[in-house]
Each structure stands twice: as C-alpha cells, then as structure tokens.
UniProtKB/Swiss-Prot annotation:
The gene is SUC7. The lineage of its organism: Eukaryota, Viridiplantae, Streptophyta, Embryophyta, Tracheophyta. Residues 1-25 are annotated as: Disordered. GO terms for molecular function: sucrose transmembrane transporter activity; symporter activity. Residues 1-13 have a biased composition (Basic and acidic residues). It is a multi-pass membrane protein. This is Sucrose transport protein SUC7. InterPro entries: MFS_trans_sf, Suc_symporter_pln. It comes from Arabidopsis thaliana (Mouse-ear cress). GO terms for biological process: sucrose metabolic process. It is found in: Cell membrane. May be responsible for the transport of glucosides into the cell, with the concomitant uptake of protons (symport system). Does not seem to transport sucrose.
Length: 491
C-alpha cells in the first residue's frame, strides 16, 4: 500500500538521516537518482497489491467479508516493522553499510512473497486442493503468508531507501529536497506502470507458462504482473547497491544510541501532547477511516457492483468480474496521474484558499461526495442490467462515471499524503516538540484507524448483503465529519 506508506516514511527519514554517517559532502545527483529509482520497483508491487490481490483472494474462495483481515498486515507492519527497521538500520555496523543490508533483505523478501502469491493456486493444487471446489484452503493459506511477507518486505525497503537518500544528501537541505522529489517521481512512475500492467488483460500471453491447470487466465495475468514487478525491483536494486557506496558506520561515545527507544518516546508524547496536535490526530484518523474501505475494495467494487460479476459464479460471471477488475486498475492509474499533478500544485492552491486547513477541509468534501456517488453509479449499473439483462456490460456512461470518480479521488488523496505531515511539522515547531516525535505520533493516527477498518468493514458489508457500498457510505460520513472538524478546530 505504498501510497498509504509514502508519507509515513517521512518519520523514518527524519529519524534516520539525523544520525547520518559522516560524509565529505553531498553525493552526486546521479547516485541519488540511482537509489531513488528503487521506489519505482516498490510502487509497482504496491500498485498490483492494491488493485488485484483483494479480488484474487476471493477467486480462491475467501468470502467477501474476510479479505480485509488479510490486509491487517499493512497497518501492523507500518506500526511495528517500519520503526523497528529504522531503529536497527540507524545502529547497523555491517561492513556493507547501514542501509544496503536492509534494502537487499527487503528485495529478497519481495521475491519470496511474489513466488508464494503468484504460485499459491499451483502450490495449493499440488498439496491437495481440488480445482472444482469453491474454496481452495491450502492456496489461501499460502497466499496469505505471501501477502504478509510482501507487506513486511515493502516496509523493510522503504524506510532505509529514504534514509539512504538522507545520508547521501549529507545534511544539505536543497539536496535532501531534490532527493525526495526524485523518490516521489519514481513512486509515481511505479504506480502508473503497476496499474497499467494490472489493467492489461492479455499479459499472460507474453508469459504463456504462467497458465496451468490450477491457474486460470486471471491468475496467470496476476503471475505475469508480479514477474514484471520483481524483475524491475531486482534490476534497480542491484544497480543501486552496486553503484552507490554505503560507508560502514561506527558508533560514537556521544551518540544517541542509549536514549529512550522510539516506541517509548511515542507513547510518552501522548501524555504531554497539546490540543492542536490532538485535533490534527482526530482529523487524520477520520480521514483514514474514510479512505481505507475504498482502498481495500475499489477494484472489487468495479467487478462486483459496476460490472455485475461474481468471483464465485460460473465462468461468465467470473469473466465479467475480471473485466471490472482490470477497468478498476485503469481507474487507479488515472487516480495516480491526477494525484501526481495535484501534488505539484498543493502549495499554491493552499495559499490561494487561505491555508492548509481550508484546503484539507474542502477536499474532504470532494472525498465525501465521491464516495457517496459510488451509490449512484452502482444503482445506475443495476438498473441497466435489469433492462438489458444480467450479463450486459455497463454502458459507456456508467463506465465513464466510475472512472471519473477514481480520477477525482486523486485530488483528496494528494492532500491526505501531504497536508497532515506539513501541519504536524508546523505544530511541532510552534510548540517546541520534536518533529520526528510529532510525525511518529501522526503515524499512529494513520495505522490504528486502518486496523479498525480492517476488522470492521468486512462484517459491516456482510451485514448488508455482502456488497461494498456499506463500507463506502461509512467512509463518506467519516469524510464529511473530518471536513467539518478540519474547518472548525484545526489551528
């Protein structure tokens, strides 16, 4: 979920780069670009994870209400793995450097997870799963294991990559901004490539060996996408780790290694936190309660509600479902393009609107309206199928409406990935609190709501007929409330 992780890594950057290895000066820009390019490989995999894996696990027989529990690994690893990797990366004395061992380990874990996910159906079949059975339990277990390893691996990769850029910048503010700008650029490249691959329905023809007795066309496409993902990641990682030196670190007598561990600082900060920061945490938490149901089930909504397919139906229904999934991946690609363009204009728009809190409040209204409009698009699609028949594809207008919602949601998503972190920095500066600590506390307001949604959205959807709309409506309400709170109580 790297869009989800992208700005949480700022906590890691601040923490890790603060104890950089002594360098003669900033490294050449070409070396920073080489390290930043790893983000393209990371985001390619995240894009596939966000667009294809929730539908795929349902094709393996998991009921609609359960995939959200598998997604729990995202916030859990964001809460535990990412700070832990940062902590130990700061203190790594390996002769290969502080960052390279963690980056290499993360890339290898991604490769392992991709094999487990892509070949889950094949491994499950060889272990006794019956192809004609609706639930392939062994494949589901292997898939879930690979899914969790993938989340852990991505969190192992991202923090050290950003910290490596901080080390290479050697404290130069302009170089640091430039390095992070390149990292964001390659994230956008990876997103677009990943969603484009996910939207292409005939990718398996390039890798014909991916289609097997246990692995149908959708499975073979997924497998092919992940082959491209791991190839890209391994190539850019090997080039960066070979080309860019990571000097061995030796702890100094006056280093901060013996200070309170980061988690202890975080929990201690809640005791002394002032009202402006509490208000920021409330708005952020509501914002992520609004976002997470859609991020979990957006492509499933396209396949299930808009296209009228069924992951557990006959071949025709599964084909409809798969068509919707691929169109949903196209929508996510449009979302990423709008997000990237919007990110470039945030500062200017914020000034014209009179401040960050007004901009955040305004785009949360857009978020609420777009989530509510999924109900209208769904009803129009259902009405069309009642008239034209249950196997009828959605009209061009319905499809365009759904894709427009995906694209428009790139606007509030860009704000969600930037404004909360900027406000946390401003509040921490004005109150005298450490920026690293404030961003760490903000991270808690992101991952805890994600865990709550992961536990709750599946059962809520099941309670109202196993569709996606109940979770989206809850998200729309949370977005509206967060908008009101942003306008009225944020400093």
């Amino acid at each position: 979920m790297s869009d989800l992780q992208a700005n949480k890594d700022e906590t890691t950057v601040d923490r890790q780069s603060s104890s950089s290895v002594d360098l003669d000066g900033p490294s050449p820009l070409r070396k920073m670009i080489s390290v930043a390019s790893i983000a393209a490989g990371i985001q390619f995999g995240w894009a596939l994870q966000l667009s294809l894996l929730t539908p795929y696990v349902q094709l393996l027989g998991v009921p609609h209400k359960w995939p959200s529990f598998i997604w729990l690994c995202g916030p859990v690893s964001g809460l535990l793995v990412q700070p832990s990797v940062g902590y130990f990366s700061d203190r790594c004395t390996s002769r290969f450097g502080r960052r390279r061992p963690f980056i290499a380990t993360g890339a290898l874990l991604v490769a392992v997870s991709v094999v487990l996910i892509g070949y889950a159906a094949d491994f499950g079949h060889s272990m006794g799963d019956k192809i004609d059975k609706p639930v392939k339990m062994r494949a589901v277990v292997i898939f879930a294991l690979g899914f969790w390893i993938l989340d852990v691996a991505n969190n192992t990769l991202q923090g050290p990559c950003r910290a490596f850029l901080g080390d290479l910048a050697a404290g130069d503010a302009q170089k640091t901004r430039t390095a992070n700008a390149f990292f964001s650029f390659f994230m956008a490249v990876g997103n677009v490539l990943g969603y484009a691959a996910g939207s292409y329905t005939n990718l398996y023809k390039i890798f014909p060996f991916t289609m097997t007795k246990a692995c149908d066309i959708y499975c073979a496409n997924l497998k092919s996408c992940f082959f491209l993902s791991i190839t890209l990641l391994l190539v850019v990682t090997i080039i960066a780790l070979w080309y860019v030196e990571d000097k061995q670190w030796s702890p100094k007598a006056d280093s901060d290694n013996e200070k309170t561990p980061f988690f202890g600082e975080i929990f201690g900060a809640f005791k002394v936190m002032k009202r402006p920061m509490w208000m920021l945490l409330i708005v952020t938490a509501l914002n992520w309660i609004a976002w997470f149901p859609f991020l979990l089930y957006d492509t499933d909504w396209m396949g299930r509600e808009v296209y009228g397919g069924d992951s557990k139906g006959d071949d025709k229904m599964k084909k409809l479902y798969n068509q919707g999934i691929h169109v949903g991946a196209l929508g996510l690609m449009l979302n990423s393009i709008v997000l990237g363009v919007m990110s470039l204009g945030i500062e200017g728009i914020s000034r014209k609107m009179g401040g960050a809190k007004r901009l955040w409040g305004a785009v949360n209204i857009i978020l609420a309206v777009c989530l509510a409009m999924t109900v209208l698009v769904t009803k129009k699609a259902e009405e069309h199928r009642r008239i034209a028949g249950p196997m009828a594809l959605p009209t061009d207008g319905i499809r365009a409406g759904a894709l427009t919602l995906f694209a428009l949601l790139g606007i509030p998503l860009a704000i969600t990935f930037s404004i909360p972190f900027a406000l946390a920095s401003i509040i921490s500066s004005s109150s005298g609190a450490g920026q690293r600590l404030s961003l760490g506390v903000l991270n808690m307001a992101i991952v805890i709501p994600q865990m709550i949604v992961s536990f709750g959205v599946g059962p809520i959807d099941a309670l109202f007929g196993d569709g996606n709309l109940p979770g989206f409506v809850v998200g729309a309400i949370a977005a509206a409330v967060s908008s009101i709170v942003a306008f009225t109580v944020l400093p």
